[in-house]
Amino acid sequence: VQTCALPISLDLKLAEVYAAAEKKAVNERPPFLRAEQRGWIKGRNDCWKSKDVSACVEDSYRRRIVELQTLYRLVEASGPFWFVCNGEPANEVVVTYFRTDPSTLIAERGDQMSLMFQQPAASGTYFQGRNESFREHQGEVLVEWGWGAPTMRCVRKP
């Protein structure tokens, strides 16, 4: 994929963020960062299949920058916040919000983790991960964890 039309600022920003992530990942075992970056490059290169190649490439860069900022805690965060779901204290979701563009959160449930991106919502806030979602509206929190899973009603712990 040609990245010539890509704003140089995105390429420079990714290089800066990747370098910061490398510093934090120095003791990772096994080393995931480089492998993930190679996978990201392959995905970005698949943008040639897209109807709008430049939009695909730009979105790919923006998402990768945010993923690195979030997963390696390179930006300001608020939380963690604990939520009890379906009235069961053992059914807990822990959420940390990150000041990224777009906004993100990491939700943890048991030994699973989901990076979610903020999506447009008519009201309240809505975050979507691969197979998970987190919706806050007027004090009510709805979480879906896993493809086709039932919606859980959650309450933030004081």
Model-identified regions with their sequence ranges:
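A generic short alpha-helical patch detector that favors 3-5-residue windows
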Residues: 9-10, 32
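Alpha-helical transition-metal enzyme core signature, strongest for iron centers
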Residues: 11, 36-40, 44, 61
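Alpha-helical segment that forms one wall of the substrate-binding/catalytic cleft
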Residues: 11-21
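Surface-exposed, polar/charged faces of alpha-helical domains
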Residues: 23-38, 42, 49-55
